[in-house]
């Protein structure tokens, strides 16, 4: 099987996705298990829970299931925002890294204009992303949004900021 060519467009999309993934992991560096599992905002999500959601509902779902057509395991939690008590935050971060590596392999083997191998019509109805290009844009936007959520949580935990604004 030949790999699709790397174009300026695909390189730009992959660079943007990599930057957002690095942001997610980078803003959490140095936090303790307790901090990663502690709800910070009134909605009660945790940093570990958000990364678990990104691993399962974003990376695994969009790339392995939708793009590659791999079935989602039956044991996947209905609420990926909740990390089981017996799973450490470090294990959640490792799972996210693994899912991004698996996703990258799928992306590298798929042309940008390839349609999804599977589409969950029961979830989305008539709404549909047409190809890998649109799926990448969707995942970049969702990951960036959640990276911003993690920025706010981190600043509330210990004052650290990913981007420091000056006057």
Predicted region positions:
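Active-site rim elements
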Residues: 8-13, 89-93
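Short, contiguous alpha-helical
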Residues: 2-3, 10, 14-29, 33-80, ...
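Acidic/histidine-rich alpha-helical segments that form the ligand environment
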Residues: 80-120, 131-144
């Amino acid at each position: 099987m030949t790999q699709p060519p790397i174009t300026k467009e695909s390189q730009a999309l992959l660079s943007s996705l990599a930057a957002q993934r690095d942001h997610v992991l980078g803003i959490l560096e140095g936090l303790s298990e307790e901090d990663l599992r502690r709800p910070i905002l009134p909605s009660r999500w945790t940093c570990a829970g958000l990364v678990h959601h990104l691993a399962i509902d974003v990376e695994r779902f969009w790339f392995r299931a939708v793009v590659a057509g791999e079935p989602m395991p039956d044991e996947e939690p209905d609420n990926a925002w909740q990390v089981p008590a017996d799973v450490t935050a470090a294990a959640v971060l490792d799972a996210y890294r693994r899912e991004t590596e698996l996703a990258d392999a799928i992306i590298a083997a798929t042309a940008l204009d390839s349609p999804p191998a599977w589409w969950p019509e029961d979830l989305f109805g008539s709404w549909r992303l047409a190809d890998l290009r649109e799926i990448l844009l969707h995942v970049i936007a969702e990951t960036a949004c959640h990276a911003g959520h993690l920025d706010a949580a981190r600043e509330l935990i210990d004052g650290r900021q990913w981007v420091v604004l000056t006057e």
